[in-house]
């Protein structure tokens, strides 16, 4: 059933504007857009504005698309007031803070949704369906390499590349494999915090022995988002390896964003708001917190 929701928006930059337009298309009315002019000298939203607009009697949910370092405080502010939250990735910049937000949402019986749009990418969803069928037959004899690189951008410089890019691919990984079954074998991040590599082993469960590699670079010469699949040769495994591009490229080699990824995540959030798929929603929030835990594990510089 379609409802006319009221919301507030924290941060009206590139992603904030995109989220606002998608929600407004679904008849969501934004009562207040908090941006730089609404901050006090300490960089926090002025208390008088919070008291005026951030109330569950006035709004149904909050959209948080402010700098990543503010996600935890704004999400906590809203969840404590009984307001559901749609927040850009990463959920927080510390694993403990991310878990705190998940627990707070459960305790207050409100929705916490992390906008990790790649999880709603139709290309990935199709890949995941077929890949999980393949490894059902192949057992644990596989290796995945997630690679995500793009040219320098001034956006998202308040966090390192792990919290900026790696969380995308960790969230994809966690939609296929259990967090409890994973072990980080190696994690290095460059001194300029623009490039990182992570190696994860699946150490428990049906796919124990499989390997997952992650490479991210936000100051690269190329623009690429791929998953490479490699199978160990056995009678059970497929006789081929392959790679999947999560985004098409234009004639200049630039990534073309798949619009249905954003559209699908907004539609799903609105389904959660009417009470549908609630258990899936809780698992997705926990997965987002687990992605932060992995992305903030003790690192080595290179």
Give, region by region, the residue ranges found by the protein language model.
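A contiguous active-site-proximal alpha/beta segment in oxidoreductase catalytic domains
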Residues: 92-156
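A short helix->loop->beta-strand "cap" motif at the edges of active sites that frequently abuts
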Residues: 28, 81-83, 108-111
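N-terminal Rossmann-like dinucleotide-binding module
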Residues: 1-43
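Active-site loop of classical SDR/Rossmann-like NAD(P)-dependent oxidoreductases
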Residues: 18, 39, 223, 238-240, ...
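Beta-loop-alpha module in the N-terminal Rossmann-like domain of NAD(P)-dependent dehydrogenases
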Residues: 19, 43-104
């Amino acid at each position: 059933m379609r409802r006319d929701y009221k919301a507030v928006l924290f941060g009206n930059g590139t992603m904030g504007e995109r989220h606002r337009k998608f929600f407004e298309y679904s008849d969501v009315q934004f009562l207040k857009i908090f941006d730089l002019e609404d901050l006090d000298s300490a960089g926090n939203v002025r208390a008088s504005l919070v008291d005026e607009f951030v109330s569950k009697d006035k709004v149904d949910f909050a959209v948080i698309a402010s700098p990543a370092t503010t996600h935890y405080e704004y999400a906590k502010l809203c969840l404590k007031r009984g307001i559901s939250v749609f927040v850009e990735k990463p959920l927080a910049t510390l694993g403990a803070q991310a878990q705190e937000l998940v627990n707070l949402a459960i305790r207050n019986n409100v929705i916490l949704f992390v906008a990790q749009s790649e999880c709603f990418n139709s290309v990935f969803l199709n890949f995941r369906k077929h890949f999980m069928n393949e490894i059902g037959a192949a057992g644990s004899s596989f290796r995945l390499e997630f690679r995500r690189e793009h040219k320098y951008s001034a956006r998202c410089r308040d966090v390192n590349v792990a919290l900026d890019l790696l969380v995308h691919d960790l969230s994809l990984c966690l939609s296929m494999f259990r967090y409890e079954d994973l072990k980080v074998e190696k994690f290095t991040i460059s001194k300029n915090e623009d490039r990182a590599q992570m190696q994860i082993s699946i150490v428990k469960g049906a796919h124990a022995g499989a390997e997952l590699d992650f490479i991210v670079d936000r100051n690269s010469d190329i623009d690429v988002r791929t998953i490479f699949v490699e199978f160990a040769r056995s009678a059970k495994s497929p006789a081929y390896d392959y790679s999947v591009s999560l985004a098409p490229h234009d004639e200049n080699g630039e990534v073309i964003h798949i619009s249905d990824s954003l559209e699908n995540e907004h539609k799903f959030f609105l389904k959660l708001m009417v009470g549908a798929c609630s258990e899936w929603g809780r698992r997705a929030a926990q997965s987002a917190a687990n992605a932060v835990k992995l992305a903030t594990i003790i690192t080595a510089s290179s």
